[in-house]
Structures are given as structure tokens and as C-alpha cells.
């Protein structure tokens, strides 16, 4: 025990030496408030602001200093008058000034531990005569400490007080470091740690989509740990820090000007987050005012709702969003504080300086060349507004009182006064067993809900609740308006917020992308991007990804998804359809006229000599070719597609099979005559019909196999260069369609060959010449059609129209070259539609009278000479 006492005395000597030396270095009169009591509470308040240069202390801190100090005195008075809380026990105080500096606060706090070091156990020290040692100027024994205000101050003081097991309750220190019970195991606070505030600030930035911001922090635990917590919360929300600045303790104007210059180097970071002490915030706003720099400030409770911070610089702070711990005004304190004046407040040694500073007057004549203070000056609603943390100061004092009350009830059950067990307090027991377990309704709170409960969590922290304020101008006066609150979640009244430029500011590294653009993030930076337009056929999966809608689909107007494009095909009312349909109808009408004429004159020599059966088959094929136009114009469907594939090749096969049968018959007849052979076989009408049908059947079989192997159907086709158009087509390739005409091409070639071979037949066989003209013209049409068909493959309208017109032209060629001359003779030259017994040849000589091979056949054959040989010929006149 003696060893421990000597160690404490040695520590006191060391501390006292440093303390006295430090006081000797400064011309600053040490002031304090000492009020004796049964139990004494220490108090630490930033009564003076931080000094400049070599000065420790500056001007009087009117709100955070004087008001908070008086709030503690007010709470002590109320507790001492309370008959239920610590009845019979008088609380005293020992209040010191921290001058807003942690080092100065540590020096001052040595006063609190002096009593623990200098208290001498009377039983151990006795005089030679047996009397006890006399102790003079004994320091007040501190039961607990209320304070400090700044986190850096509380951290320094807590490190000292824990050595002597003195509990400490702060009313304003919010550094997250103070939640570490392994280091600050005698510290508690009525305010929440800063990581709640940091989370609230980050949620405000995310709410307004401010993803690229600058930060400024005060040097010290409050600013540094607060901004560190904010940066962690910002990263979780993909918010980037453009530049992170720090204001040192030098309090030099140049340092603040330098910070503003650095902030201006990031023009896209229009929002600046401040985690600063009040005096640092005021100096920074003043520096911004000097260069007329405009930012949107988002500030912590170090700024809060203090008008003194923006005084004289309101226009550069206009629109600022600030946070303040959720609290209610203590109306009883208002009445108490407004009743104070220098003439009735003698226990506060700083109150006279406060009065002179507030009213800009002097309580002594000719002091600082100020006018003498009017004795009628008073604190009232026109010059006073309650500081935001008064409630927390009162709650801190009451929390300590409740803990002492429970301890006194436990240790001294039979008395309302202090018993011997409490004369030497066990600080550890007071903190662990009583202080951390207090739970009471806040005094002077008009609301009796959950928000009025005062208690500590396991880390000694208060509950996290914040009000959100907006600096506004109303009627030429600047004031803070509450626009929201945060308690686990953010709630904002956006419509009531005023902005410096009348609209929500933007603070982003890159400009927002257009609705049709995606963000291409830059490596290592989640807030800077390059906007890349999506392709017209792409939609936005998210703001970073464009995705192809796929063939046949197109993005919606807002690019949030895709929809199926309407199918495009030729409509009957389209100009692309009207032309081919008109031509086909005209051709079909002409075909009907020819058929009608042939049927009406079915038994005339000309019709008989033309080979009626093959002519009717040929006319049917021509009619079918005209019908193909309607199939190609109609909306594609499985049935229509089957008819297209079946009808196109078959219609041509019918036409060219009939023509091939005719030309083959003529060629065989004349080849037989030239070779001196007898009448060729299979030249009768029925034989020719069967031959023709056989040739047609080959095409039908081929097409049928094709239809079986490749089932007809439709497909939605999109050209790569025209993704916005979906064409409804048959599920057959253009090349397959043309390959299916291979057999027809063979028929055309054979017809052309036979027509060429029989081109020099006698006049009465000049039908072969007309067949030749037909085939030559058909070849020209198809030779022109094929390149056009392939070249126009990108435009299905042109391709389809070309196909229809080409098919119709083939029909017109047959009608014009083969049937038009016959119809003309039948209708307009009937005198030529007779039987002749001798042929009149221009360059061929007749060798004998006509002799009929068969009188009963459809044609009468006579011997004539063709190129000097006797041949068979029909009996009709030349066409």
C-alpha cells in the first residue's frame, strides 16, 4: 500500500512540474469554478476558443462554452433541489476550461486527479505525539467528470482518468475511437459515435446521387476518425473521394485558403463533406468567402445549426446540408439562462467576459475603448438561441447523478446521506455496475416516447439519432430549417430544401450518360466513366451493360427491355403489290380470252392444226403462272409457302413441257422425212398429252420430295444492316428456290434447241418459228431476272416484285408469240382458217399432188419438199 502511495506521489510530482511549467509559459490567468459538496463532479468545457499563434486560449465561446457550462450548473442546482434524486446528498462541481485544445485540457485535468494523489490515509501518517497529520488545501475529491466537448480532448482526458478509475461522461465527443472499451474503459457519452453520423451523411449523398465529392477534416480524433468512418460508408455506396484535405492545428488563415484552392482543382466535385470542429468550419467558410467559392456543403454536427459559423459568409454557405444530434430544447434552461447577468452570476468567472463580448461593451470604464454596458441589457429571445447540445449536457449530469443515487441506495441502505462506504468512491464499481446500467426518462423532455429514454449501450454510447438542417434565406435573413432526420434510415423533405442555384446540384466525376448510353468505367475508379452509345438494337441491362435484343426484337423507348418487332411483308394495298397484281390480272384476262376463243373455235382447222390438247395444257400453265403472283404477294404462311414452292416450278414445267412436246414432235417428223423414215411414233394427240404429262410429273415428284425433306413454313428474317425490320418470309433460301427451277431450265434449254433446229421448216410449219421466238425471249427474260433477283436480295419488296413481273412476262411471251397470231386469224382473218391441198412455198418446189396420210386424223398430211426432200405438213394455211 505504501509503495502504491509513493508511486502516486511520484506521478503527481511529475505531472505537477509539467503543469506549473506550462502555466508559467503563458500570460493567461487560470480560472475555475469550485463549489463544494458531498460528492463533486468535474466539468470540462471549451469556454474559450482555440488561440492563435502562441496563445493557448482565444475569444469566449458563447454557445458551446458558456451555455454548456451554465447547463451543468443548472442541472446541479435542479438535482440538489430534487427530493427523490440523491436526497440528503449535495453535489458540488469543479469546472475547468479546455480552451478547445487537447493538450491544454490534459493540463487542466490534472486538477481532477490531484485529490487522488494527495489524499493521505490518516491511519498511516501520525505525528510523534500520536495525533493525526494536518492536511491543508486539500483538492476536491472528484466522483466523476462531465466532458469534454471535442473528441480529441475527451481522448486525452480519458487516458488520464482511467489511471485513477474516475468515470467520465461526455456530452459532445463522438469519435468512434471512444467506443473501444479496451482503451477507454471508464468513458461513456450521451451522444452516439460518429460512425452513425458518417452513415447518415453517406446516405444523404447517395440520396442525391452525389457520387464524387471532396472531404475536409479537422486534425484530431473527431475529424480524422469521423472522415475515416465516412469514407468507409462512402465506399459501400460507390461514392468516390475526389480530394481529401485536412486542416491542422495551426489555425493559420493560409492553411484554410490552401484547402479552398485544392477543392477548386476538382470542378466536378461540387459537394464538399466536412467533418470539422466548429472553429475550423467557420475559418474554412470564411476562406471560401474570400475567393467567392461556391460549393454545396454537407457538414457534421461540428457545424450543426450554429449561426456563428456562417456569420458574414452566409451567401457561400447558402444551401448547406448540416447534421445535428436529435435533441429537444430545455425550456427551463432558457428561463434560467435569460435570468443571468453579471450582477447576479458571481460563480461563473467567465461570465463577465461573455457579457462584454456578446453586447460589445465594457463593464469597466474605458476598457478596450468600448462604451460602458447598459445596466438594462439582458439576454432574451432576440439575442439568444439555445445551443443544440444543452440537452446532452443536462442528461450527462443526470446520468452521473442516477448512477450515484443507485450506488448510494445500495451501499448506504439505511441513510439518505453518504455513509463511510461512499466516502472513498470505487470508480470501477460506479462505472461498471451502475453507470452503464442506468435507464431513465430525460428530464425536462416534453416528449415521453422512446426518444426520451437516456441509457448507454455496452460500449457506453448513446443512441444514434440526427436531425438534418438546411441553411436557407427567408425574407433576407439566413436561418437553419429542419428538413429531415436520420434514425437507422434517412427521411428527407426534399421539397423544403433550398439550393444555391435553385436546383439540386450535381457532383459526379463524369456527366450522366444519355438514356441510350452505357457507362464504361475507368480502371480503378468506380465514379468516373466514359459514355458509350448503345447500338440501336441494344437495350440497357444496367447502367454499365448494353445487350443485343436479338433478331426480330427492338429495344423499348426507355431501353429497359425489348419487344417483338411487327412482321413486315407486302400488303395488298402497297404499291409494290398493286403493279404485279395488275399485270397478273391483265395476263389472266388475256389467257381467259384465248381459252374462250379456242373453245368457241375448237373445231376450226387452225385450232385443230395447233394441237388443241397441248394448247389447252399450255394455257393452263400460263394461267397458273399468273396465279403465282397472288401467292407471292399474299402474307406468308405454311400453306402459302407450300403453294409457292409447288406452283412456281410446276407452272413453268407445264408450259415448257407442252412446248417441248410440240417442238420434239415437229423435229422428229422432219428428221424422219429427211432420213426417209416412215411416220414417227407417238405423234398422235393422246401420245403427246401423255408425254407432256410425264414431263410435268417429273417436276411434281421433285417438288413433292423437296416439300417432304424441307417442311414448308415461315421465318422471321432480319437483315444485319436493317435490324429494325423483321421480314416474314418462307423458310426456304433464295438459292433453294432457284435450284428447284433447275428442271424447268432444262426444259427451256431443250425447247430452245428444238426450236432452233426446226427454224427452217416449211411455211406451214412456221409455228416452230413462233415457238423459237417464245423460247429466245424467255431466255432473255430469265437471264435478266437472275442477276436482279440476287442483287435485290436485301430488299424483299423489290425481289418479290421482280419475281412476279418476270413470271407474268413469261406468260405474256407465250400468249404473244404463240397464241396472239392464231387468235388474230381466227377473229380477224377467218378466210385463212381453211384447209389447203397444196402448200405455197417461197423457196421450196412442189414435187407432186397432195396425198393424205390419214383422212380421219385431226390433221391432214401431204407430201411436200423441204430442202429437196419430201416431208409431211399440215393442211392449214401459213400463219
Swiss-Prot record:
Organ and tissue specificity: Is widely distributed in the CNS. Predominant expression is seen in the neuronal cells of the cerebral cortex, dentate gyrus, and glial cells throughout brain regions.
Cytoplasmic side: 600-613, 665-688, 757-769, 829-879
Principal location listed in the UniProt entry: membrane
Disulfide bond sites: 57-99, 240-527, 361-373, 412-419, 509-528, 513-531, 534-546, 549-562
Extracellular topological domain residue ranges: 23-576, 635-645, 710-734, 793-802
Residues making up the signal peptide according to the UniProt record: 1-22
UniProt record similarity statement: Belongs to the G-protein coupled receptor 3 family.
Protein name (record): Metabotropic glutamate receptor 3
Species this protein is from: Rattus norvegicus (Rat)
Amino acid at each position: 500500500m505504501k509503495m502504491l502511495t509513493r508511486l502516486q506521489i511520484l506521478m503527481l510530482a511529475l505531472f505537477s512540474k509539467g503543469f506549473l511549467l506550462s502555466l508559467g509559459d503563458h500570460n493567461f490567468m487560470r480560472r475555475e469554478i469550485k463549489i463544494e459538496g458531498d460528492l463533486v463532479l468535474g466539468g470540462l468545457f471549451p469556454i474559450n476558443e482555440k488561440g492563435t499563434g502562441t496563445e493557448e486560449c482565444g475569444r469566449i465561446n458563447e454557445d458551446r462554452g458558456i451555455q454548456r457550462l451554465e447547463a451543468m450548473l443548472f442541472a446541479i442546482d435542479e438535482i440538489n433541489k430534487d427530493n427523490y434524486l440523491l436526497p440528503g446528498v449535495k453535489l458540488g462541481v469543479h469546472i475547468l476550461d479546455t480552451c478547445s485544445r487537447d493538450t491544454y485540457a490534459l493540463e487542466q485535468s490534472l486538477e481532477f486527479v490531484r485529490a487522488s494523489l494527495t489524499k493521505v490515509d490518516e491511519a498511516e501518517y501520525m505525528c510523534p505525539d500520536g495525533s493525526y497529520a494536518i492536511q491543508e488545501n486539500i483538492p476536491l475529491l472528484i466522483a466523476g467528470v462531465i466532458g469534454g466537448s471535442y473528441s480529441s480532448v475527451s481522448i486525452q482526458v480519458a487516458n488520464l482518468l482511467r489511471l485513477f478509475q474516475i468515470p467520465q461522461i461526455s456530452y459532445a465527443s463522438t469519435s468512434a475511437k471512444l467506443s473501444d472499451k479496451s482503451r477507454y474503459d471508464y468513458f461513456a457519452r450521451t451522444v452516439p459515435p460518429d460512425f452513425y453520423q458518417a452513415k447518415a451523411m453517406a446516405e444523404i449523398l447517395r440520396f442525391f446521387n452525389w457520387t464524387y465529392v471532396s472531404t475536409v477534416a479537422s486534425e484530431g480524433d473527431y475529424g480524422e476518425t469521423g472522415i475515416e468512418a465516412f469514407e468507409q460508408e462512402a465506399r459501400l455506396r460507390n461514392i468516390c473521394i475526389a480530394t481529401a484535405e485536412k486542416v491542422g492545428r495551426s489555425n493559420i488563415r493560409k492553411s484554410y485558403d490552401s484547402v479552398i484552392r485544392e477543392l477548386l482543382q476538382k470542378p466536378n466535385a461540387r459537394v464538399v463533406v466536412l467533418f470539422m470542429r466548429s472553429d475550423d468550419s467557420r475559418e474554412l467558410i470564411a476562406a471560401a468567402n474570400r475567393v467567392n467559392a461556391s460549393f454545396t456543403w454537407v457538414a457534421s454536427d461540428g457545424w450543426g445549426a450554429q449561426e456563428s459559423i456562417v456569420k458574414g459568409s452566409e451567401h457561400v454557405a447558402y444551401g448547406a446540408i448540416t447534421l445535428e444530434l436529435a435533441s429537444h430544447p430545455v425550456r427551463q434552461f432558457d428561463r434560467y439562462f435569460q435570468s443571468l447577468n453579471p450582477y447576479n452570476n458571481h460563480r461563473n468567472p467567465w461570465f463577465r467576459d461573455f457579457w462584454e463580448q456578446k453586447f460589445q461593451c465594457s463593464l469597466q470604464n474605458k476598457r478596450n475603448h468600448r462604451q460602458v454596458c447598459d445596466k438594462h441589457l439582458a439576454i432574451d429571445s432576440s439575442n439568444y438561441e439555445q445551443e443544440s447540445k444543452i440537452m446532452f449536457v443536462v442528461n450527462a449530469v443526470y446520468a452521473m447523478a442516477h448512477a450515484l443515487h443507485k450506488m448510494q441506495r445500495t451501499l448506504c441502505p439505511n441513510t439518505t446521506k453518504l455513509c463511510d462506504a461512499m466516502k472513498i468512491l470505487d470508480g470501477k464499481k460506479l462505472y461498471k455496475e451502475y453507470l452503464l446500467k442506468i435507464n431513465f426518462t430525460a428530464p425536462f423532455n416534453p416528449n415521453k416516447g422512446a426518444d426520451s429514454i437516456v441509457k448507454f449501450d455496452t460500449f457506453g454510447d448513446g443512441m444514434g439519432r440526427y436531425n438534418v438542417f438546411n441553411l436557407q434565406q427567408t425574407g433576407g435573413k439566413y436561418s437553419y430549417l429542419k428538413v429531415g432526420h436520420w434514425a437507422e434510415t434517412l427521411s428527407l423533405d426534399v421539397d423544403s430544401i433550398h439550393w444555391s442555384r435553385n436546383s439540386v446540384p450535381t457532383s459526379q466525376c463524369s456527366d450522366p450518360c444519355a438514356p441510350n448510353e452505357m457507362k464504361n468505367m475507368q480502371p480503378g475508379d468506380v465514379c468516373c466513366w466514359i459514355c458509350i452509345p448503345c447500338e440501336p438494337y441494344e437495350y440497357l441491362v444496367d447502367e454499365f451493360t448494353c445487350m443485343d435484343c436479338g433478331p426480330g426484337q427492338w429495344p423499348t423507348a426507355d431501353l429497359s427491355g425489348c419487344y417483338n418487332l411487327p412482321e413486315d411483308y407486302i400488303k395488298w394495298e402497297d404499291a409494290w403489290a398493286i403493279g404485279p397484281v395488275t399485270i397478273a390480272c391483265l395476263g389472266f384476262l388475256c389467257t381467259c380470252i384465248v381459252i374462250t376463243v379456242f373453245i368457241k373455235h375448237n373445231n376450226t382447222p387452225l385450232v385443230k392444226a395447233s394441237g388443241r390438247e397441248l394448247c389447252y395444257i399450255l394455257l393452263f400453265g400460263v394461267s397458273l403462272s399468273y396465279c403465282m403472283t397472288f401467292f407471292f404477294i399474299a402474307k406468308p404462311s405454311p400453306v402459302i409457302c407450300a403453294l409457292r414452292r409447288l406452283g412456281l416450278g410446276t407452272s413453268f414445267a407445264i408450259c415448257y413441257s407442252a412446248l417441248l412436246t410440240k417442238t420434239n414432235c415437229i423435229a422428229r417428223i422432219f428428221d424422219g422425212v429427211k432420213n426417209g423414215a416412215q411416220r414417227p411414233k407417238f405423234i398422235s394427240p393422246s401420245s403427246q398429252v401423255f408425254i407432256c404429262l410425264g414431263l410435268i410429273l417429273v417436276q411434281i415428284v421433285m417438288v413433292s420430295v423437296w416439300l417432304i425433306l424441307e417442311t414448308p413454313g415461315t421465318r422471321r428474317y432480319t437483315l444485319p444492316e436493317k435490324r429494325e425490320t423483321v421480314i416474314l418470309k418462307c423458310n426456304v433460301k433464295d438459292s433453294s428456290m432457284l435450284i428447284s427451277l433447275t428442271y424447268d431450265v432444262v426444259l427451256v434449254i431443250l425447247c430452245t434447241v428444238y426450236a432452233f433446229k426446226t427454224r427452217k421448216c416449211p411455211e406451214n410449219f412456221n409455228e416452230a418459228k413462233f415457238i423459237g421466238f417464245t423460247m429466245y425471249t424467255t431466255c432473255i427474260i430469265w437471264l435478266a431476272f437472275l442477276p436482279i433477283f440476287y442483287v435485290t436480295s436485301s430488299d424483299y419488296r423489290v425481289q418479290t416484285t421482280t419475281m412476279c413481273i418476270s413470271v407474268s412476262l413469261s406468260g405474256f411471251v407465250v400468249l404473244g408469240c404463240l397464241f396472239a397470231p392464231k387468235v388474230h386469224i381466227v377473229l380477224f382473218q377467218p378466210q385463212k382458217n381453211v384447209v389447203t391441198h397444196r402448200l405455197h412455198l417461197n423457196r421450196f418446189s412442189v414435187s407432186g399432188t397432195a396425198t393424205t396420210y390419214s383422212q380421219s386424223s385431226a390433221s391432214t398430211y401431204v407430201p411436200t419438199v423441204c430442202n429437196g426432200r419430201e416431208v409431211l405438213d399440215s393442211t392449214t394455211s401459213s400463219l
